[in-house]
């Protein structure tokens, strides 16, 4: 089960109703209250929260979700599909997607989003015929992203990830984690506290600041 705060998409009837003040929008306090209510309801039905917005019964957590939150590479196929690969997979990626060209020298991770429309994709299904929005991340950016995603997991940021990040970020990482712990966003185990869960944007934003050095 996934539980997310309401997102109002531009151009929808809902957005027009909000703009015309015909539909109320919950504020941050309302959203936090609803998240806590959903957590209590799902917990009473045997569901445990394993990620900020994801719940499952014991042993039934979604493996693709866990792969995404822990930085494991994944391939998405079709219009709008997203993919992510590490630098060690670039050579294989180049053979399947020659249109991407050579990545920047400092790239450690690549994110792809397929922009090919359905009609063209049906007529030209080969991977080499597809178009993508491409984003390259440096090693430091990749580690900051993994720290941010790790903080979304109920089990928290792993010691192995902290060790890898410290090799690149040094004392900046320790200072950031100490600050987040002192401000009660993270527990000593580096798992998100209830405050960190409800005020996730602050927690993730401060971790992402490590990406710029």
Question: Could you say what each language-model-derived stretch is?
Answer:
Residues 38-42, 180, 203:
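Hydrophobic alpha-helical packing residues
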Residues 141-148, 174, 197, 201:
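Non-catalytic, well-ordered alpha-helical scaffold segments
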Residues 156-157, 186, 213:
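Intrinsically disordered or highly flexible coil/loop and linker segments, enriched in small
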Residues 1-167:
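C-terminal scaffold of the Radical SAM
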Residues 195-213:
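Short, amphipathic alpha-helical interaction segments positioned at domain boundaries
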Residues 181-190:
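A short, conserved structural fragment
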Residues 166-181:
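Short amphipathic alpha-helical interaction segments
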